[in-house]
Amino acid sequence: RLLMVRQYRNALERYTLELPAGKLDDPKEEGIVCAARELEEETGYRSDKLEWLITLRTTVAFCDERIEIFAAHDLIPTRQNLDEDEYIDVKAYTLDELKKKIFSGEIEDSKTIAAIMAYAVKYNR
């Protein structure tokens, strides 16, 4: 099962279903450190077993943004630590449920789609 977050996105003026994500606190911060922090802050779970999955370049014609995707295994419950303006619901889904949500259009976030599909390929699911 994969943990997903449902949160309101102002740019779309609606809620979206995404994988937990965030940005580096400092340009020198390692992606895996950021991933661990954001996982715990947004979901209330931590993992001592984060594994690099893929690196994405979002729009190579326009910017140099890079997104690193990690898979978190053996989750340990802690507690959410949300920003004042964050309201996030957390729910676990099977990979098959998430694939259906992608192809029905319920999941539109590109990093989430890429991560789910990469996970499915890597783990032959």
State what each model feature region is.
Residues 1, 8, 72-77, 95-96, ...:
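Short loop segments at secondary-structure junctions
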Residues 1-37, 75:
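Conserved Nudix-box catalytic region and its N-terminal flanking loop in Nudix hydrolases
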Residues 15, 52, 60, 85-125:
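Nudix hydrolase/Nudix homology domain
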Residues 18, 69, 92:
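Short aromatic/basic micro-patch
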Residues 46-53:
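A short coil-to-beta-strand element that immediately follows conserved catalytic motifs
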Residues 59-79:
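Active-site-adjacent beta-strand/loop module that shapes the phosphate/pyrophosphate-binding cleft
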